[in-house]
């Protein structure tokens, strides 16, 4: 009986100590864990700057994605796009990715609207922050959270030699009829493996080296429409949908640069 009482007392003491230890620890919810990377990113990229919460920065993404490798993602910003007042850049962060900085899109008044639709990668459930910078220096931010996983690592897809040979091929099309002096929408499909450097190559049992598009430039009749600095967070075979203003028929041209020195060009006559 005495031994049983001693065991009971020890259990009570251990339980009490455990409860006290838990009470002494700061609460760490899932939401707080997801927010932690963004706090660090703000210090790295926007130290000393004010980011204004902006509901007019619209983000479209699924709450849950079937695959983290190809997650549809779009933003559209309700803001003037005139020579005096426009959104000059939009930065996309996937906070939980190995490389959170996914892309920086640079816009001009000829973009017509600061918007983009594409596909991005998620290594794990993560908030996505979209930061828009106006030409007056003001910064606007909005966010969504997406549940997805496995988009950056895993096994490298397909035949590496075939993927390298096809890299840089492009197709462009206009969404709908040409509208003179109005916002037109273009669709650009790029063949490129967009290797992250974190994918296992089954043939070598090592990691397939990173190989990705790092710069995209779009012009209309030789004038800048938009450009993008991209990284491994953009999905394989990138798809980009964007707008541009065209006052008269001309050529829409795209130039790509990848991290291995490759340069690729594609043009499309519009309105002819």
Residue ranges and their predicted role:
Residues 2-20:
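N-terminal secretory signal peptides and thylakoid transit peptides that target proteins
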Residues 26-53:
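C-terminal segment of N-terminal export signals and the immediately downstream linker at the start
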Residues 43-70, 162-180:
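N-terminal edge beta-strand
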Residues 60, 72-80, 185-193, 201-204:
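Short edge beta-strand/loop segments characteristic of extracellular beta-sandwich folds
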Residues 108-116, 232-241:
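Aromatic sugar-binding surface patches on proteins
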Residues 123-127, 183, 247-251:
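Extracellular Ig-like/FN3 beta-sandwich strand-entry sites
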Residues 135-141, 257-266:
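Short acidic/polar inter-strand loop motif in beta-rich domains
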Residues 145-151, 269-272:
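Short beta-strand edge segments in extracellular beta-sheet folds
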């Amino acid at each position: 009986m005495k031994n049983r009482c001693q065991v009971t007392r020890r259990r009570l003491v251990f339980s009490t100590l455990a409860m006290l230890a838990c009470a002494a620890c700061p609460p760490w919810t899932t939401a707080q864990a997801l927010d932690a990377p963004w706090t660090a990113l703000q210090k790295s990229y926007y130290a000393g700057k004010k980011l204004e919460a902006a509901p007019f920065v619209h983000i479209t993404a699924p709450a849950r994605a079937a695959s983290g490798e190809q997650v549809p993602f779009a933003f559209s910003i309700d803001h003037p796009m005139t020579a005096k007042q426009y959104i000059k850049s939009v930065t996309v962060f996937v906070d939980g990715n190995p490389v959170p900085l996914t892309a920086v899109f640079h816009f001009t008044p000829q973009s017509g609207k600061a918007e983009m639709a594409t596909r991005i990668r998620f290594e794990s459930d993560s908030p996505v922050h979209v930061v828009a910078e106006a030409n007056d220096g003001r910064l606007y931010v909005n966010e969504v959270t997406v549940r997805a996983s496995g988009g950056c690592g895993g096994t490298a897809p397909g035949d590496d030699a075939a993927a390298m040979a096809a890299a840089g091929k492009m197709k462009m099309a206009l969404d709908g009829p040409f509208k003179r002096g109005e916002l037109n929408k273009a669709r650009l499909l790029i063949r490129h493996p967009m290797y992250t450097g974190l994918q296992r190559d089954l043939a070598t049992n090592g990691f397939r080296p990173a190989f990705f598009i790092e710069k995209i430039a779009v012009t209309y009749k030789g004038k800048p429409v938009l450009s993008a600095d991209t990284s491994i967070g953009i999905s394989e075979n990138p798809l980009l949908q964007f707008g541009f203003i065209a006052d008269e028929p001309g050529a829409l041209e795209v130039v790509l640069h990848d991290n291995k020195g490759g340069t690729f060009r594609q043009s499309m006559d519009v309105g002819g």
